[in-house]
Each structure stands twice: as structure tokens, then as C-alpha cells.
């Protein structure tokens, strides 16, 4: 599934989105940008015009991209006859001059720490000695938050995505230093008291903007949620526990893909029953590398790497072998489960310290859902609806392909028999048989991937955004050192087509070897504090990328995917061999790109004067709406068949071919949603009151595994009561207690789609309505008011149980 990486903002100085992220001289001049705008909602008849073709080639043709980079450098006078890669003009990562080396990152963090401490000192002095100090206090608090987030966000990105271990080590060190200081600020009583007094002084608030007051209230709220009323000893304990949770979370995410064992032993007599002789031969070839076994003469060790385990799960008719392989693939290491148990215990401890019933109550207090009871009700109703709507029917289709099933048995089987009769290790095996049977009467399907190159999809998205938002993508050449892989990372400016002004920048790496699809906010939009003279243009030019007037910093987002390059040769690019065939995507991967671009456009359009509530810095159970909504566009033939072209012939994708592939794709659609609801329920249970009670009675021996198995038994449908898969669920940390957000936002997105875009997904009128009611506000407006405006339903503005009922009704 496609999940964006977002770090939850439970404290006022906590980092921005992570895990859901240009120097002006390298931006094309306004006269170079494709002009013209239209109020028409007509969809483009072709994405083959000059700007789209250029954008497509930037991503699909490595030689074209290299030529573009070289040409841009030569045109701007950066080099003479040397290729751009040998340019003497250097930059740092994301055009931050400090980030040219790992050591530079550490120095940047130390300098930023000094700057932050100096700003705090001046704020605390000015607020008492000068009336202007009270008026500028919230702006400076926001600037303080931005100074720290500017370091922590880029460090988090480097820690997760950078290919160099030296950079990763420096980022880890940086993150720990800055995060500890942020936690100290979150419990700084003097900072809080000044803010509280300012917000309660009507003579001051009368002179503040509405956004300044909103940000002030937001920061005050989070101070209070960080235990500001505790005694000094308790506050220090709070900071220490919060820091420990951060470290545990980092360890949890780093070990998420590790298995308890990379070998699975099965009886030799079962192995001999395997029908695939080539597979048997391949497995036997690994035996010399297998770890020693007490029963080596009676067993065979199957490696849990490469295609072997997945081939067994889809083709092996011996259930006992599938069972052992499936459990082994889903078992986390004992250390990973211990890490999970520890951060769950510490979260429950924090919630108790702050006077909340549970960590879930703490997290949901200011979210759309308001409390865990509403979430559990939403999920329970959703699961009931899904079971009635199609889950049972989908599993029944699988059940009939069990090796021991007869038509009579299928007809006589009860719903419980059917659900219990299909185990999790049966899913892929039976689905493979179902798909083969479904394909028997179909002609050989043409490969749809050839219509879906990366460049085609990016260019198509630009055309779509131009149609509905009047913004487009413009490629930008990068300086040496500006990206983590100059040969691979593409940079595009998001440009308002009516004004030709930049809204922000995207750094796109579709071929990362180490990161699942993710959206990282590197810099948030923010108006510079030039009027109160707490920062200067000259200094900010070295750190961020500014707008044309040099009065605001532009948002910078990095989108990372782990797509495989086509025709990767063994010689490699350093021998002068480049891929000529573009990277071709599956429909699921297209959904992923659309999803992540939804987050990106939220950051680009949701520009605010203060960074704390810009772009994706809104309620966590609202932040997925723009990304989930984009999946409705990627699934609509009126969109995909307009933008998808064969990478060689330029032939458009036919609706018939798309429909055939989509039919294959959604065979277990209801089951997939149900499984996601189980994960959301697990997230609630592991952050519930029961956990608080359990650790109060026996802190040391808390174990999440029995809780996981108990919930699986209760909710059924591919129930897992054997493995420790919950240790492989990254969002238990990054989305603790709010994983339901995806399902809630999917329900909201369905309402938005049907209310605005279902009639015409290329509609400028619908796009403007959506942009002005939801996207442009960032986090400065109550989400329920945004929805009430977008859907023209005043009942939603209350955000009560009735509003939740309206959203949940007939959804999904």
C-alpha cells in the first residue's frame, strides 16, 4: 500500500512531514516558461506539446537529461566547455550552502543551535522591555521553530534516504542533538508564559493577524500537551522519555525489514513433493550456505530471499510448506518486538504523566476524530459494511480453488467456514489460481506498463494540475552537490501559470535503492521576518530558496520511490552505457506517484506566512486527503487514457486495455481495505487504556504479541495468530494512534470526488473550488470547516459525531 511518511506534530517545535518534503540563477527565465492560461476545463487532447515532451524526456531519457543539465550550466555561465558534472560552481544539498559535506551538516546543526539559543535570549529580553517585542513574539517563535526544523527535517531525510553511510551517521548525530533541544524548548516555562500572556492580552491580539493568533494558539496548546505545568523534575523526565521514544522509533524503522531468520527449515519428505524441478534445484544449490541444523539429514533449508519464498507462496500446492514460509517471512526479530514493546510502554507512560487515559486519547484530542471511541466506532462500522459489501464474496471466490474443495462443499459452507478455511498463506496461492481461471477466456493482455513511463506520468500530472489548478512543472538544472545523486535526481519548479511565479520546488528520485515511496518536507513556506529585522536576505539566500521578491522562503519537497530502472546493464553508467528504455510503471506504481504528488501539491498551494501551519502541517487525520484524492484521478480512464502514451509509438492507452488490467488489479479490493482496517484497529488497541493499565501492573513484562494475535482472532479474514508481523508495521511508530487517517480520508476523498470531480476530472471550476476550500489553507483552518465549504454542507462544520456519520455513510 502507498503510505506517505509524516512525523506527527505532538510538540510545537517538532519536525514537519518526513515518515507523511534553487538558487534563483538556475530557474528558467519567465520568458522561457510556457505561457498562456485558460478558464476552460477542457482536457488536453495530447501531452505531446513542447513543454510536456521536454518534461517527459527529462525523466525518460538519461542522455537528454544530461544534455539539459550541461546546456543549462553553460548558458548560465557556470562553466565553459566542461560537462555540467565537472562544474566548478558547487552548492549544498537542496541549495543549502552548509550541506556540501557530512561534516558541514554537523556544523550547520551546531550553528543553528547557537542561532536558536540567541533568538530565544533576545525574545525573552524584548518581550519584557519593548512593546514591539510582544507584537513580534509569535513570529519569532515561528522563526525559532523553522530554524530547528530546517535542520531536523533535512537530517531525517538524509538519515532515511541518503546513499552514503557517512552522511547517514552525521544525520543521526544531528537529529539527536537538535531533537533534544527541541524537547527542552517544549518544556520552557518562560517561553510558554509569555505566549500565554500575549494571547490573553486583547490590546496585543487586536494588532496581530488571524494567522498569527492561530499559530500562537497552536503553539500554546502544544506547550500544554508537553507537560508545561509539571514540576521541573517531571518535565526533565518527560524530555528524557520523549527522547528515548525518538531513538526507539528510529531503531524500529531501521530494522523494519529484518526477519527473525533468513532460512526456513522444512521436512525433506515435503521438499521432495515439490513439483517444480527448477525450483528444487535452485533451493538445493543454497544448502551449502545454510546454517548448521540438528536435523540436517531430515530437513531442507529454504532461503527467504529473492523470488524463492514468493514463488512457493504462489505456486506450491503443499499447504504445510506454504504455512512455514509465510510465517517465517512475517516473523520479526525478537529485538524488533522488544523495541516495539518499549516505545509502546513509554508512550503509555507519557500519556499517564500528562493526565490522559491513553496515548490514543492524547493523540486524538485535537484531531478530526476527537477521541478513540469515535475511531473505533468508525472502524467497526466500516468492517461490518465491508463484510456485507464484498469481503465474504471475494474470499468465497478463493475458497472454491482450494485443492480439497468441491462444488458441493463450497455451496454448503457457511460464511464462517469460508473465512476460516482460507488462511493467510493460502491467499497468494489461491489468488494465482483465480487469476489464471479468469484469464482463460481473455485474449493475451498487452503489457500496459509500456504506456506508463515515469516521464509520461510526470508530464501528465503537470497537464492535469495546469487544467485544474493553473500550475505546471518546469524542469530546473541542479548545481553540483545540490542533490544526493546528480545523475538520478530531477528537480522541477512548480509554477503558477498565470503569474509565472514559482510556488516551490520538487526533488524527485524515482530510483532510490533504500526508501519505500515517501514524501519529505525539507523546507516549509514562510514569510521572512525582514520587517522585525530578526533575519536578512543575504543570510537566508545561503540556506533556502527564495521567491522572486526575496521576501519568502519557498517550500522544498522531496519525493522518493524505489522503482526499478529498465534494462540495467552490468557495465553501468560510468562505462558510458546509459539506459535507453525508460522506467515503465505498473498501475499500482502510477497510483503511488499520484498519491505522493497529492502531498506535494498540498505543500505548494498551502503557502502561509508562518511555517507552523503551512502545507501538510495540518491535522494528521486530514493530511492524507489530498494524496488519497489523487488516486481517484489515477484510476479514472478520462485522466489516464488522456495522459498515458506508448513510450515508443506515442499511441494513447485505450480504455479497453485499461479496464482489463484494472479488473485484474481489484480482485481482492474489499479484502485489502478490510486488512487496512484491521491494521488501524491494531494501532488503536496498542495505544489504548488497556495498555496503560497493563504497564501499571507489570511494566517490565508487557508484550504486544498476544494483543496482536487476540485481535486477529476476533477480526478474522486472513487471521494471523502465528507470526509477529506487527513488528513490521512501520506506522505503529510514525502514525501512532492515527493510522485510521487513511481510511477516514479515503471516505472524505470519495465525498470530494463525487461532489466536485466525478462529472469532469479536468474541471478548472472544480479544481479552484477544491484549492480554495481545502488546499490553500494548510493547517490554518478547521478541517471540518474546509469540508463544509467544499461540499456545501453546513452540518459538517460542527465536526461532531453527526459529521463523522455523514462522512462514513455509504463510503468505501
Curated annotation (Swiss-Prot):
Record's subcellular location: Mitochondrion matrix
Transit peptide, residues from-to: 1-29
GO cellular component annotations of the record: mitochondrial matrix
Compositional bias of kind Low complexity: 37-46
Domain of life where this protein originates: Eukaryota
Listed GO biological process terms: intracellular iron ion homeostasis; peptide metabolic process; protein processing involved in protein targeting to mitochondrion; protein stabilization
Disulphide connectivity of cysteines: none
Cofactor entry: Zn(2+)
Stretches for region Disordered: 19-49
Keywords, ordered alphabetically: Hydrolase, Metal-binding, Metalloprotease, Mitochondrion, Protease, Transit peptide, Zinc
Residues that, per the record, bind Zn(2+): 595, 599, 602
Subcellular location, principal: mitochondrion
Cofactor comment: Binds 1 zinc ion.
The enzyme's E.C. designation: 3.4.24.59
Enzyme class name: hydrolase
Positions of the catalytic residues: 596
One MF term in the entry's GO annotations: metal ion binding
Similarity field: Belongs to the peptidase M3 family.
Biological function: Cleaves proteins, imported into the mitochondrion, to their mature size. While most mitochondrial precursor proteins are processed to the mature form in one step by mitochondrial processing peptidase (MPP), the sequential cleavage by MIP of an octapeptide after initial processing by MPP is a required step for a subgroup of nuclear-encoded precursor proteins destined for the matrix or the inner membrane.
Official protein name in the record: Mitochondrial intermediate peptidase
Organism encoding this protein: Scheffersomyces stipitis (strain ATCC 58785 / CBS 6054 / NBRC 10063 / NRRL Y-11545)
Top-level taxonomy: Eukaryota, Fungi, Dikarya, Ascomycota, Saccharomycotina
Amino acid at each position: 500500500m502507498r503510505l506517505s511518511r509524516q512525523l506527527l506534530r505532538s510538540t510545537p517545535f517538532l519536525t514537519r512531514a518526513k515518515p507523511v518534503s534553487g538558487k534563483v540563477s538556475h530557474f528558467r527565465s519567465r520568458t522561457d516558461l510556457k505561457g498562456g492560461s485558460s478558464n476552460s476545463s477542457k482536457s488536453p487532447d495530447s501531452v505531446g506539446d513542447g513543454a510536456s515532451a521536454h518534461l517527459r524526456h527529462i525523466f525518460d531519457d538519461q542522455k537528454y537529461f544530461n544534455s539539459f543539465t550541461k546546456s543549462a550550466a553553460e548558458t548560465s555561465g557556470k562553466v565553459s566547455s566542461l560537462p555540467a558534472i565537472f562544474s566548478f560552481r558547487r552548492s549544498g544539498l537542496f541549495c543549502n550552502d552548509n550541506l556540501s559535506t557530512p561534516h558541514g551538516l554537523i556544523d550547520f546543526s551546531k550553528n543553528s543551535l547557537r542561532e536558536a539559543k540567541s533568538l530565544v535570549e533576545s525574545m525573552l529580553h524584548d518581550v519584557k522591555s519593548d512593546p514591539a517585542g510582544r507584537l513580534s513574539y509569535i513570529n519569532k517563535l515561528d522563526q525559532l521553530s523553522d530554524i530547528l526544523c530546517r535542520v531536523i527535517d533535512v537530517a531525517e531525510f538524509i538519515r532515511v534516504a541518503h546513499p552514503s553511510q557517512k552522511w547517514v551517521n552525521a544525520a543521526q548525530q544531528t537529529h539527536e542533538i537538535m531533537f533534544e533541544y527541541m524537547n527542552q524548548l517544549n518544556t520552557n516555562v518562560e517561553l510558554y508564559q509569555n505566549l500565554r500572556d500575549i494571547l490573553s492580552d486583547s490590546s496585543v491580539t487586536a494588532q496581530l493577524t488571524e494567522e498569527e493568533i492561530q499559530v500562537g494558539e497552536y503553539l500554546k496548546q502544544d506547550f500544554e500537551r508537553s507537560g508545561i505545568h509539571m514540576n521541573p523534575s517531571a518535565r526533565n523526565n518527560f524530555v528524557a522519555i520523549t527522547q528515548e521514544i525518538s531513538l526507539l522509533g528510529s531503531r524500529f524503522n531501521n530494522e523494519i525489514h529484518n526477519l527473525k531468520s533468513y532460512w526456513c527449515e522444512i521436512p525433506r519428505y515435503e521438499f521432495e513433493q515439490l513439483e517444480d524441478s527448477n525450483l528444487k534445484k535452485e533451493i538445493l544449490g543454497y544448502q551449502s550456505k545454510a546454517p548448521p541444523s540438528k536435523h540436517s539429514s531430515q530437513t531442507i533449508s529454504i532461503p527467504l530471499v529473492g523470488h524463492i519464498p514468493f514463488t512457493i507462496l504462489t505456486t506450491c500446492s503443499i499447504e504445510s510448506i506454504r504455512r512455514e514460509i509465510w510465517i517465517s517471512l512475517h516473523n520479526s526479530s525478537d529485538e524488533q518486538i522488544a523495541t516495539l514493546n518499549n516505545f509502546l510502554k513509554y508512550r503509555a507512560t507519557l500519556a499517564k504523566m500528562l493526565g490522559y487515559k491513553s496515548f490514543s486519547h492524547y493523540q486524538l484530542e485535537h484531531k478530526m476524530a476527537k477521541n478513540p471511541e469515535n475511531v473505533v466506532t468508525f472502524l467497526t462500522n466500516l468492517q461490518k459494511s465491508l463484510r456485507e459489501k464484498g469481503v465474504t464474496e471475494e474470499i468465497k471466490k478463493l475458497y472454491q480453488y482450494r485443492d480439497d474443495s468441491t462444488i458441493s462443499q463450497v455451496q454448503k459452507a457457511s460464511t464462517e467456514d469460508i473465512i476460516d478455511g482460507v488462511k493467510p498463506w493460502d491467499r497468494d496461492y489461491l489468488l494465482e489460481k483465480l487469476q489464471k481461471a479468469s484469464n482463460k477466456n481473455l485474449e493475451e493482455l498487452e503489457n500496459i506498463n509500456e504506456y506508463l513511463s515515469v516521464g509520461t506520468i510526470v508530464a501528465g500530472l503537470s497537464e492535469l494540475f495546469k487544467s485544474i489548478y493553473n500550475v505546471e512543472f518546469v524542469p530546473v538544472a541542479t548545481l553540483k552537490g545540490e542533490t544526493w545523486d546528480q545523475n538520478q535526481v530531477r528537480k522541477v519548479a512548480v509554477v503558477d501559470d498565470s503569474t509565472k511565479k514559482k510556488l516551490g520546488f520538487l526533488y524527485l528520485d524515482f530510483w532510490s535503492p533504500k526508501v519505500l515511496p515517501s514524501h519529505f518536507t525539507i523546507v516549509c513556506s514562510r514569510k521572512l521576518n525582514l520587517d522585525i529585522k530578526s533575519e536578512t536576505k543575504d543570510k537566508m539566500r545561503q540556506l533556502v530558496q527564495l521567491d522572486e521578491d526575496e521576501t519568502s522562503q519557498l517550500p522544498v519537497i522531496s519525493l522518493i520511490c524505489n522503482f526499478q530502472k529498465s534494462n540495467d546493464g552490468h557495465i553501468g553508467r560510468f562505462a558510458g552505457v546509459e539506459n535507453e528504455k525508460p522506467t515503465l510503471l505498473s498501475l499500482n506504481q502510477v497510483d503511488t506517484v499520484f498519491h505522493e504528488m497529492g502531498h506535494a501539491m498540498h505543500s505548494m498551494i498551502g503557502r502561509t506566512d508562518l511555517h507552523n501551519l503551512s502545507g501538510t502541517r495540518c491535522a494528521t487525520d486530514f493530511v492524507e486527503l489530498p494524496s488519497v484524492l489523487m488516486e481517484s484521478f489515477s484510476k479514472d480512464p478520462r485522466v489516464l487514457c488522456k495522459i498515458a502514451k506508448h513510450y515508443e509509438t506515442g499511441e494513447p492507452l485505450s480504455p479497453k486495455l485499461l479496464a482489463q488490467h484494472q479488473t485484474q488489479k481489484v480482485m481482492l479490493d474489499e479484502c485489502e481495505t478490510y486488512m487496512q482496517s484491521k491494521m488501524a484497529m491494531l494501532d488503536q488497541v496498542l495505544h489504548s487504556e488497556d495498555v496503560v493499565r497493563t504497564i501499571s501492573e507489570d511494566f517490565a513484562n508487557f508484550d504486544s504479541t498476544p494483543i496482536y494475535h487476540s485481535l486477529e482472532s476476533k477480526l478474522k479474514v486472513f487471521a494471523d495468530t502465528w507470526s509477529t508481523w506487527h513488528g513490521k508495521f512501520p506506522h505503529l511508530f510514525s502514525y501512532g494512534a492515527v493510522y485510521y487517517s487513511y481510511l477516514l480520508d479515503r471516505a472524505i476523498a470519495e465525498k470530494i470526488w463525487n461532489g466536485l470531480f466525478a462529472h469532469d476530472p479536468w474541471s478548472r471550476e472544480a479544481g479552484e473550488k477544491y484549492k480554495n476550500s481545502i488546499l490553500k489553507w494548510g493547517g490554518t483552518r478547521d478541517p471540518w470547516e474546509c469540508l463544509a465549504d467544499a461540499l456545501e454542507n453546513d452540518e459538517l462544520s460542527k465536526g461532531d459525531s453527526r459529521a463523522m456519520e455523514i462522512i462514513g455513510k455509504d463510503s468505501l
